[in-house]
Amino acid sequence: MSLLTEVETPIRNEWGCRCNDSSDPLVVAASIIGIVHLILWIIDRLFFKCIYRIFKHGLKRGPSTEGVPESMREEYREEQQNAVDADEGHFVSIELE
């Protein structure tokens, strides 16, 4: 009998399920997969901001500076800072009277 066709019936004033074949390996595997899926879904919903922030910033790291002389590293930092400073000119300053 399939789990999809099981019927819940009142047994001794409690609701129960007549599952005679619950020791079937397929049923056990499906139950374990279902429980693991539920746990992972709950963790994802609770910590989705942290999880996706790690993925987002982890993949957007700058180029590796291993083996690059310090002078070139400083030049690169200055170029990056100048690019950021140039972008600040695009914002409009609004003053309220």
Curated annotation (Swiss-Prot):
Residues 1-22 are virion surface. Pfam families: Flu_M2 (PF00599). The record marks W41 as: Seems to be involved in pH gating. The keyword Transmembrane helix applies. The record marks H37 as: Essential for channel activity, possibly by being protonated during channel activation, and by forming the channel gate and the selective filter. InterPro entries: Flu_M2. Residues 60-88 are annotated as: Disordered. The M2 protein from most influenza A strains is inhibited by amantadine and rimantadine, resulting in viral uncoating incapacity. Emergence of amantadine-resistant variants is usually rapid. It is found in: Virion membrane; Host apical cell membrane. GO terms for molecular function: monoatomic ion channel activity; proton transmembrane transporter activity. The chain crosses the membrane at residues 23-43. Belongs to the influenza viruses matrix protein M2 family. Forms a proton-selective ion channel that is necessary for the efficient release of the viral genome during virus entry. After attaching to the cell surface, the virion enters the cell by endocytosis. Acidification of the endosome triggers M2 ion channel activity. When the channel is activated, one or more imidazole moieties of His-37 probably become bi-protonated. Homotetramer; composed of two disulfide-linked dimers held together by non-covalent interactions. May interact with matrix protein 1. Cytoplasmic tail plays an important role in virion assembly and morphogenesis. This is Matrix protein 2.
